[in-house]
Amino acid sequence: MVDYTDLRASLYVPANHPKLVSGMFESNGTQAPSYILCTEDSLSDSEVPLALRQVSSLLPKLAKRNGAAPVFLRPRNVDLLREFLNMDGIENITGFVIPKADVDTLPSYADLLVGRPYRIMPVLETRSIFDERGRTELREYLNRSPLGPAVLALRIGGNDLLKLLGLKRQPGISIYQTPLGTLIPQLMMCFRPHGYQLTGVVCDSLDDADLLRREAQMD
């Protein structure tokens, strides 16, 4: 059984990455503690077919990684989730990261996932998350939905939330120095007392070790 602490610092990888398959089987000590293979906003529409071919090639091989890092797929939409679920070897992944998760979008994903053995990580990255009522409605939906027990953690979509504010992360600036620095504690107070863990916002400046260190301390 995977625990949310097993995620540690998840590595987002575009599913069309040329080393998607080979990189996950390297034995030189560079493997990530967990992987999220993304087919959503890291790809353009024209890049999706290659991404699907690579995922289809990778899935059966994951059976050889017993005890290895958890692997999640981030589908672009419900149609791609359906396609993933029909692929050979899909049982070898840990679960799915659900983009743009709110009370309007989650029911369609639930229709496909309830009753299956996958863990899910909804991403909080829509306009409703800024509103207290929107956060409460999402929490109550998860509490009563059969999908709720499958939630491993809630992810905070920092870049998308900043985009909704007309902002963009700047080099050297921590997410906690942006308006999201006041939103993140509100998310914690809304969800964590009810048993829902939250992950830290992805730090996309991997070449800035000081920034990564500061964000990890705040997380």
Where in the sequence are the language-model features?
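Expand to "…catalyze enediolate/carbanion chemistry for C-C bond making/breaking, isomerization
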Residues: 1-219
